[in-house]
Amino acid sequence: MNIYDVLIWMALGMTALLIQYGIWRYLKGKGKDTIPLQICGFLANFFFIFALAWGYSSFSEREYQAIGMGFIFFGGTALIPAIITYRLANHPAKKIRESSDTISA
């Protein structure tokens, strides 16, 4: 392992940290900074970074089919919590109907 490999792994770690900070800021800005949404966002971030790490390590080992498999499997897995987090964060609040004092027939 040379210095460039170490720098790549450090860059992936910093990218994971920055993405998680962005998810936190996004959810806080929407007013939906809850633990379940944070966990769901973390899972999306983890699988995305893991897919990138899998791709890089497979490329360095010259296993080109493993790159595609990692992107399909882990990248596809990252889409599920990412979509759930995005949809729940942008879900509008339910409107409460005001009850009237009169009875309509």
From Swiss-Prot:
The keyword Transmembrane helix applies. It is found in: Cell membrane. It is a multi-pass membrane protein. Coiled coil: none annotated. Keywords: Cell membrane, Membrane, Transmembrane, Transmembrane helix. The chain crosses the membrane at residues 3-23, 35-55, 66-86. GO terms for cellular component: plasma membrane. The keyword Transmembrane helix applies. It comes from the Bacteria. May act as a membrane anchor for the tetrachloroethene reductive dehalogenase PceA. Belongs to the PceB family. This is Probable tetrachloroethene reductive dehalogenase membrane anchor protein. It comes from Dehalobacter restrictus (strain DSM 9455 / PER-K23). The lineage of its organism: Bacteria, Bacillati, Bacillota, Clostridia, Eubacteriales.
